[in-house]
UniProtKB/Swiss-Prot annotation:
Its EC number is 2.3.1.-. The lineage of its organism: Eukaryota, Fungi, Dikarya, Ascomycota, Pezizomycotina. It comes from the Eukaryota. The modification O-(pantetheine 4'-phosphoryl)serine is found at residue 1741. Residues 1706-1781 form the Carrier domain. Induction: Expression is highly induced during plant infection. Residues 39-464 form the Ketosynthase family 3 (KS3) domain. Polyketide synthase that produces (R)-mellein, a secondary metabolite that inhibits the germination of wheat (Triticum aestivum) and barrel medic (Medicago truncatula) seeds. Condensates 1 acetate starter unit and 4 extender malonate units. The nascent pentaketide intermediate then undergoes an aldol cyclization and is aromatized via dehydration. The (R)-O-methylmellein isolated from P.nodorum is most likely to be derived from (R)-mellein via an additional methylation at the hydroxyl group. Interestingly, no O-methyltransferase gene is encoded in the vicinity of MLNS on the chromosome. Disruption phenotype: Does not induce any observable growth defect but impairs the production of both mellein and O-methylmellein. This is Mellein synthase. Coiled coil: none annotated.
């Protein structure tokens, strides 16, 4: 029997990252034209470039050079505009600056989404980095290296760069600097970004050697390869010219061409022209390149770098140094200079540079040559300019092209050779026209020169690589066979059509000379494989072009397979499913037999068939005549075995297998249990026995579930349910007559029935007669082995049962039911989602789809290998294509080794990304002087009018007052600055009818401000400078007069007023009152020295800028004095604590012509008009003798509306935790299986007994480790409930270790449930923990904080923590309290935590002596005292009277004599300590790990040695923060965080027992109350502190735990954007240092053990409550008055939510993408691929919080912190929100 010819088979791997055996290289003959290959040479295997003139590839650049084109032109004017606007002096200079050069068009464009970079980050990236990324990707594709294959490799990246224009543009705009600008604007960011995005682990460095940078980078990369540091090196350079600064400098130095062109070697050369561009080359050792099948463009024979030493000037060229570095490179290469035919010169076109360089080149390469064969020289610079840092690399690209093509291109812009060079004697010739470059006896060689103006000289020698015949060339016979062309793209499928069109355009006719197979191999093995994929099954170039064009136009075709890969978190391993009887058709084997792999596989099996049955199965396949069911099964098995090998030959391998009926035999072969021959023995011997039962029975597919049919048939044996096919169908089997009768009944009931093509009742009792003969015939013929991959049984009810595939198994397979649905379900439960039916026609694929859908698998695929009457070859390729487009890894070696560099490369999808900087800091624009405390900038008189306008720009850099003056967190211009502005603008002394309309905010955004004096009126107006179309806002208006009326009030008798008022109040009275109203600070520094006050009048003595002898601002300014007047004046109305601001002044008069004094009096009385406006005052400013200096009449203070919280007083910033009755769910939790975990045997038994009536199945375990190790075996129920009950602790000594153990038990259980995707609810049951009455309660206390974080990170798993205060198991809260993190079960009532204000009833009685404040006579112990919060606490204690503080720290503090030598980190801390000690306090240090086992003893010993007065107070502020999600934590990381919190607190508890101190203060955190994700360990430690405080107070101690919010700018998590957003997402804010200590003092009045210190944010009327804890304290803004108005763009989006389920998903898709686009800064939501993880778009942690807030606001549903972690794509989030809405949450 003839065997088909074997097709060519690839011999080597095509992956660039996979090396073949070392012997492969030696089998390749040396290239022709060389005497010998130096395998240690470094090969250039790929390159790409970008230059002016639209040259975006080496080929385009070559044509450009050959055509003598040049790309010189003007710099785009918009680039220099920011510098023009930055300083008024710049414009004239820039006008005279040379602006011509060689510029890349559309430099601002970048394909950010391709690299997963967000628009916001992209605009903060230097174009150097953008060019570097794109050109590197192009170069790797040119090299035939899949960039993704380099991940984790030692690939080196060296990139030359020496300009930072974009960095200066962004970073000199200081107020607008953002986080990403750091890495985005650095030089090292260029190579580092390449390494980062490609996940490279080799060296990565920027090289700056001026204009030699890129050649130094090439040399360094070559050295890295030769040294064995890196297998591949990415080298080159990038240059961008954005700023006029360097143009101006170079022009001034005479280095630049006035005409903006390079005239290398020309007599008229007068300087160089700057050029933009990038060139990247890919290097690899020659031996590796040959082994890997790379195309070698040239070899680098030698390279050298040096410095030219001390010359006439550091920038002067040195011919001797240039000569020496060339000779060094030649020596290294072992090459005679006379064999180098072409030199690519540096040739900068400078009068000195060109002659100097030519003399050096002549000395090396020209001298000694025959006059008729001079060395040829040229330079690329007249074509594309001097690319400076990239100059050497672009020259190298040109030289490589010349060496490859055998042509020396012509020199551009050469009219007359430079006469300073003696060309006749030089041995050199400048090529004016393109010249053929042929050599007979040696390869073409070229030299490249590159020099830096700082003195760096570099040189390289390259050599032609003449390609040998490829021994692995694919057979031309393959050209008519179908093959696969693969295209892929990241971030949205919209890229694919453009790629397809480009490939179609090239493939015919341009690509016709390339074999279709080599094109396919290029795309499959040497290009990246992204998420969006399309595969094309084609047989010719013409068909390929047509199919690709169809796809590019959006058409569908059978030859096109398109899909996005399955999500990253989905298992992409394949399950092969071998179907059983019924897939056969007459022509199924005819084409398959033409395939050599198939034929070789089945030929040995045909021998077995002939021996066993007496006929040839191969002949039967050829004829297509199948005479019996037995023969069908033989041929079915044979084709399946052939398909196994055929699929493997196509690079497809299974990871699990399932067999259906007779398909189980082939499945067992695929799994390695049987040999193919053993399988055929089973099939043939069964077939022989089937002759006894043929024709007696049959089978039908029925559209009813298996269980239903089984019940309906009862115990019948004549008809049975034979195959459990899918959730809605099964196959019945039986004797013909009763089967037909039953089927007829089913049809009459309207049930669909289909006959199976068989005359045997398989899987029925009818075949039991064959059982014994079959078993006997197989015994001794089989040697079954264990499977080598996952194998599911369909012959066993337990489909995972590892039954041996022996004779008895195959009897069961023949007689017993087929459990296909359970087997597929088991595979689904084991996370398989890709199923391939291995058969000649699909018969179970529908059942697979149905079972997958039934099991909730939303992202899956089923694929079949062949289909009836269709080309087998194309069907199999179609299946391979389907697998690949779903993300399955396919080994494409079958496509061969040959590949093509000409296949079109990446098509970029460019968009503009450019950071629009402000016009510069406002203070740089000849604007107002902030120290004069006014807003008067440039003055302009409007012609023909009585109007004068002062214009200025206002931002934080030009704030006209020295200190923060905030309203609702934003600085606003104080009234005193308006007054000072009006006085100075008009020159008047009187202002009247002054209105304060709208606050003028001072922010980073520059505002244009106008002060307009129009006749006798004056006003201030502003608008944002970036919004020219925005209308002007008027902030304040007034009328003015020149001089006051003659009616001057007499001097005030100050002593008489003081006597009349009588009452003297604290100097801090005014400041304290203003703080209560929420005013955190004054606009100017002033202090009250004396304050006399009653309800009608005040006399106050003040000092401006009290810490200085003279004031630190313009002495003529009334700003500070009037700020004090308006601030202190407001306190006349202190009867009610309300925030008020000045809204109106009737009249303000300045009487004095002298500057205001530093010290002065204020006299304040109620205004006579106060009956109309209750809060109006008259204020007089007097000097110390009582003389009137200024007077404000009827200044009106108006209450501020819509303050962000109920009140800004300190009372509103402290809260208690109250426990309110929980809302009960109408639907109880379903308890199908309960797993009890506890180390307490007695509790385990008690709870198990009490729960017996609640759940049918209860499992008891003594540890979470046992759950982890064995849980997967018994936790199969969908509604499992895991309950953890920590044990009992009897001794205080065991509390710390038990606490850690309890925490880790919970962590272990949660990790197990998450990692195994088990659907369960997890509960923790505590025993009176909140009451804190025992060591058990203390040890369990840490679980409170842990519970809230787990609830946040894993809300789908978390059932709740129930703190049970009753004797029985808390069944009721377990079942009916849902979606709560913690529940206390008290007297049969479940209660949950809510924040509430403290009540007066909680205060101490007035006679109580307890306090939280220090006394001078005591000693105070402070842990964590050297941290940010600790130092502030130390300062506060000293402020309040402490004189001795002992600071406990793990740091070793040097002796005071050594403090001057302290480390950089420690020195500022010690300086702070010294400053505090200057107040008279003493600070002592004890170096101690407070978490150590014997810490309390060490502490007491240390205190004893210090011999200080008794310790009266302890503050425990120590802590360690290690943020990590619970599933990523380790026991050790928990221990590090818990040690200072739990062990440290216990050490202090032991050292200072309850009742021995005045106070015991613990620093806890609000993070554990609101469930801050990532802080499970920190939260656990802090909640322990809460319980310890309660424990001590229950024993009579004055202990309190402060549950602090973040302290603004302080602590372990300073107030960054991330922290601010995180707090806002919880509905809370940070507090300032002073607010925190005000809270401390305030709580000194209360008899409580805990205090939550935070402020809440105001919510919109319909906003979702961000945290249930805030339910009773949050303030909601009033609804808009017109609720009946039609919804506008600002109306609630959720109001339009569709009610129909079908419409909800697309609606959610749009809404979520709108939110994502808003956060990312993307204009078109279509740019957001719903299947791409948001992290791939560059969404970082800050954006994640912002997105969560946007989603919560738009969709009006609470969004968990972990949503974007657990549901990382838009598609996944749509599913989550849809579920929430449909469940009515």
């Amino acid at each position: 029997m003839a065997t088909p010819d074997d097709p060519a088979t690839p011999a080597l791997s095509l992956s660039a990252s996979n090396s073949s055996s070392p012997t492969a290289a030696s089998s390749v003959p040396p290239p022709t034209g060389t005497s010998e290959i130096q395998y240690d040479d470094v090969a250039i295997i790929g390159m790409s470039c970008r230059t002016a003139g639209g040259n975006d590839s080496p080929e385009k650049l070559w044509r450009f050079i050959m055509d003598k084109k040049d790309a010189s032109g003007e710099s785009p004017s918009w680039r220099w505009e920011p510098w023009v606007r930055r300083d008024t002096r710049n414009a004239k200079v820039i006008e005279k600056t040379i602006s011509k050069g060689y510029f890349i068009e559309d430099l601002e464009n970048f394909d950010a989404s391709f690299f997963g970079i967000s628009p916001k980050e992209a605009e903060q990236m230097d174009p150097h980095q953008r060019l570097g990324l794109e050109v590197t990707w192009e170069a790797l594709e040119d090299a035939g290296i899949n960039p993704q294959s380099l991940s984790g490799s030692d690939t080196a990246v060296y990139v030359g760069v020496d300009s930072d224009d974009y960095s200066r543009l962004l970073l000199e705009d200081i107020p607008n600097i953002e986080a990403w600008m750091g890495i985005g604007t650095t030089a090292h960011g260029i190579p580092n970004r390449i390494s980062y995005h490609l996940d490279l682990m080799g060296p990565s460095a920027a090289v700056d050697a001026a204009c030699a940078s890129s050649m130094v980078a090439v040399h360094t990369g070559r050295q890295a390869i030769l040294a064995g540091e890196s297998r591949i090196a990415i080298v080159g350079g990038v240059n961008v010219c954005l700023s006029p600064a360097l143009f101006h400098m170079l022009g001034a130095a005479g280095a630049l061409s006035p005409d903006g062109v390079c005239l290398s070697f020309d007599e008229e050369a007068r300087g160089y022209a700057r050029g933009e561009g990038a060139a990247i080359l890919i290097l690899k050792k020659m031996s590796h390149a040959i082994m890997d099948g790379d195309h070698i463009l040239a070899t680098i024979k030698g390279s050298a770098i040096a410095q030219d030493g001390k010359t006439n000037g550091i920038m002067a060229p040195n011919a001797k140094a240039q000569e020496l570095v060339a000779r060094k490179a030649l020596k290294q290469a072992g090459i005679n200079a006379l064999t180098v035919g072409y030199i690519e010169a540096h040739a900068t076109s400078t009068p000195l540079g060109d002659p100097t360089e030519v003399s050096a080149i002549s000395a090396v390469y020209g001298v000694g040559r025959p006059t008729d064969t001079p060395a040829l020289i040229g330079s690329i610079k007249p074509n594309v300019g001097h690319l400076e840092a990239a100059a050497g690399a672009i020259s190298l690209v040109k030289a490589v092209m010349a060496v490859q093509k055998g042509i020396v291109p012509p020199q551009t812009r050469l009219n007359k050779l430079n006469t300073r060079v003696d060309w006749a004697k030089s041995g050199l010739h400048v090529v004016r026209e393109s010249t053929q470059w042929g050599t007979e006896d040696s390869p073409r060689r070229a030299a490249i020169c590159s020099y830096g103006y700082g003195g760096t000289v570099s040189h390289a020698i390259i050599e032609q690589f003449a390609h040998a015949a490829d021994p692995f060339t694919a057979s031309t016979s393959d050209d008519n066979h179908p093959t696969l062309l693969l295209l892929s793209a990241p971030q949205g499928k919209q890229r694919l059509p453009a790629q397809s069109a480009a490939l179609a355009e090239w493939i015919s006719p341009a690509g016709a000379h390339e074999s279709l197979r080599s094109i396919a191999a290029t795309l499959a093995t040497r290009r990246a494989h992204h998420e969006n994929r399309a595969a094309f099954i084609v047989s010719s170039h013409t068909e390929a072009a047509e199919t690709l064009n169809l796809f590019s136009k959006g058409a569908e075709h059978d030859s096109i397979v398109q899909s996005r890969t399955l999500d990253n978190n989905i298992n992409k391993q394949i399950v092969w499913v071998f179907s059983g009887h019924g897939s056969h058709w007459s022509g199924m084997g005819k084409q398959l037999l033409q395939n050599a792999v198939f034929y070789r596989t089945v030929a040995p099996l045909d021998i077995v068939v002939v021996q066993e049955l007496g006929y040839s199965a191969i002949e039967a396949l050829k004829t297509g005549r199948f005479e019996s069911s037995g023969q069908v099964q033989v041929l079915t098995y044979m084709t399946q075995i052939g398909l196994i090998q055929l699929l493997k030959a196509k690079g497809v391998h299974p990871h699990a297998v399932i067999g259906h009926s007779v398909g189980e035999i082939a499945a067992s072969v695929a799994a390695g249990c049987l040999t193919p021959e053993e399988g055929m023995i089973i099939v043939t011997r069964r077939a022989r026995l089937f002759a006894k039962v043929i024709g007696c029975g049959g089978m039908f597919l029925v559209s009813l579930p298996f269980a239903e049919v089984l019940a309906e048939l009862g115990g019948r044996t004549d008809i049975v349910a034979a195959i459990d096919s899918s959730p809605s169908s099964c196959v019945i089997s039986g004797l013909n007559a009763p089967l037909e009768e039953y089927v007829e009944k089913l049809k009459n009931r309207g049930i669909r029935v289909f006959q199976v093509k068989t005359d045997i009742a398989f899987h029925s009792p009818m075949l039991e007669v064959l059982s014994k003969p079959l078993k006997e015939s197989l015994e001794g013929s089989l040697n079954p082995q264990p499977p080598n991959i996952k194998l599911y049984s369909t012959s066993q009810a337990d489909t995972r049962h590892p039954a041996r595939r022996d004779a008895e198994y195959w009897v069961d397979n023949m007689v017993k039911p087929v459990w296909l649905r359970p087997a597929v379900t088991a595979a689904i439960e084991d996370h398989y989602r890709i199923f391939m039916e291995v058969s000649t026609h699909p018969i179970v694929s529908h059942s697979l789809d149905e079972t997958l859908a039934e099991n909730g698998a939303s992202d899956f695929t089923t694929i079949h290998t062949m289909k009836k009457e269709q080309s087998a070859e194309k069907c199999i390729l179609h299946a391979v294509a389907q697998l690949w487009t779903k993300g399955v890894k396919i080994d494409f070696k079958f496509l061969g080794r040959q590949w093509s560099r000409e296949v079109p490369k990446i098509r970029w999808s460019h968009k503009r990304f450019w950071k629009e900087v402000s016009t510069g800091s406002a203070s740089a624009q000849t604007v107002h002087d902030p120290d004069k405390n006014n807003m008067l900038g440039q003055r302009m008189v409007v012609a023909g009018t009585n109007m004068t306008i002062f214009t200025t720009a206002l931002d934080e850099s030009s704030k006209p007052f020295p200190m923060p003056h905030q309203l609702h967190g934003t600085d606003i211009i104080p009234v005193s600055v308006y007054v000072n502005t009006f006085i100075k603008a008009t020159g008047g002394k009187v202002l009247s009818k002054m209105e304060l309309r709208v606050p003028l905010a001072v922010t980073n955004d520059v505002r244009n401000v106008q002060v307009i004096v129009d006749g006798q009126s004056v006003k201030v107006a502003s608008r944002l400078s970036s919004s020219d179309d925005m209308s002007w806002v008027t902030h304040s208006t007034a009328s003015w007069e020149n001089e006051p009326s003659a009616n001057v009030l007499p001097s005030l008798d100050v002593s008489s007023v003081i006597k009349r008022i009588g009452t003297r109040v604290s100097e801090t009275f005014s400041v304290d009152y203003l703080k209560k109203t929420g005013v955190s600070g004054m606009a100017f520094p002033w202090a009250v020295n004396d304050h006399y006050n009653n309800t009608k009048e005040m006399l106050v003595t003040l000092d401006n800028d009290p810490e200085h002898e003279t004031m630190s601002w313009d002495p003529c300014s009334w700003g500070a004095t009037l700020d004090a007047a308006t601030s202190v004046g407001a306190t006349l109305f202190s009867r009610e604590v309300k925030l008020r601001i000045v809204s109106h002044i009737d009249r303000l008069t300045i009487y004095s012509s002298d500057p205001p004094p530093k010290r002065y009096h204020l006299y304040v009385t109620e205004a006579s008009s106060s009956q109309v406006h209750a809060c109006s005052a008259d204020i007089s400013v007097l000097d110390l003798s009582g003389t009137l200096l200024a007077r404000i009449e009827s200044i009106r203070f108006t209450e501020v509306e819509a303050t962000p919280t109920k009140s800004t007083s300190i009372e509103s910033g402290v809260h208690q935790i109250a426990w309110v009755p929980a809302r009960l769910s109408e639907k109880p939790l379903s308890l199908e299986q309960i797993v009890l975990v506890s180390e307490d045997d007695a509790k385990l038994e008690q709870y198990a007994n009490e729960l017996q009536r609640q759940a049918p199945k209860i499992v008891k375990l003594t540890s979470a480790a046992k759950l982890r190790d064995n849980g997967a075996l018994f936790m199969r129920e969908k509604n499992a409930t895991v309950i953890y009950c920590p044990g009992t602790v009897t001794s205080l000594e065991d509390v710390a270790s038990a606490s850690h153990r309890f925490i880790w038990e919970v962590a272990t259980a949660i990790k197990f449930l998450v990692e195994n995707s088990i659907s369960a609810k997890f509960f923790v049951i505590l025993d009176r923990t909140f009451l804190a009455g025992s060591p058990t309660a203390l040890a369990q206390g840490a679980l409170y904080g842990l519970a809230r974080v787990v609830a946040s990170e894993h809300s789908d798993i978390w059932g709740g923590l129930i703190d049970n205060e009753g004797p029985l198991f808390p069944v009721m809260p377990l079942k009916y309290v849902q979606d709560q993190d913690i529940t206390r079960y008290i007297d049969g009532v479940p209660r949950v935590a809510r924040m509430r204000p403290f009540t007066k009833q909680q205060r101490y009685a007035p006679s109580t002596a307890r306090t939280l404040l220090p006394k001078p006579e005591g000693t105070y112990v402070l842990t964590g005292g050297l941290g940010a919060l600790g130092l502030e606490t130390c300062d506060f204690l000293i402020e309040k009277g402490a004189r001795r503080i002992v600071v406990i720290s793990r740091r070793d503090i040097p002796a005071r004599s050594q403090w001057s030598k302290a480390s950089e980190n420690l020195a500022p801390i010690l300086e702070r300590v010294k400053a505090m000690e200057k107040t008279g306090a003493s600070i002592y240090f004890v170096s101690l790990d407070i978490g150590a086992a014997d810490a309390h003893q060490q502490l007491l010993f240390a205190l004893e040695r210090l011999s200080l007065p008794p310790v009266l107070g302890v503050i425990h502020a120590s802590g360690v923060l290690e943020d990590s999600l619970l599933v990523d934590t380790t026991s050790d990381s928990f221990a590090r965080v818990l040690s200072p919190k739990i062990s440290g607190a216990l050490a202090l508890h032991k050292a200072f027992p309850p009742g021995t101190l005045d106070f015991f203060v613990l620093y806890s955190s609000i993070g554990q109350l609101v469930g801050t994700s990532g802080q499970s360990s920190y939260a656990a430690g802090n909640s322990f502190l809460d319980v310890l405080a309660a424990h001590r107070r229950s024993q009579g101690d004055n202990a309190i735990a402060f549950q602090w919010t973040a302290w603004r700018g302080l602590g372990m998590a300073t107030s960054t954007d991330f922290l601010t957003l995180e707090l806002q997402s919880k509905g809370i804010t940070d507090v300032g240092r002073d607010e925190a200590f005000q809270a401390w003092e305030h709580m000194s009045k209360y008899d409580v053990d805990q205090a939550v210190v935070t402020r809440t944010l105001a919510l919109e009327a319909d906003d979702i409550l961000p945290c249930a804890l805030l339910e009773e304290v949050v303030v909601r803004k009033a609804r808009a008055q017109d609720q009946s108005a039609p919804a506008s763009g600002n109306a609630s989006d959720s109001s339009g939510r569709p009610t129909a389920s079908a419409d909800l998903k697309p609606w959610l898709d749009v809404k979520i993408r709108e939110c994502v686009a808003l956060v990312m800064g993307v204009e078109d939501i279509e740019e957001i691929d719903t299947r791409v993880p948001l992290s791939d778009y560059g969404v970082d942690s800050i954006m994640t919080i912002a997105l969560r807030q946007k989603l919560q606001s738009k969709l009006k549903i609470k969004v968990p912190q972990t949503l974007m972690w657990n549901y990382p794509t838009v598609s996944a989030m749509v599913g989550w929100f849809q579920k929430q809405f449909e469940e009515g949450q």
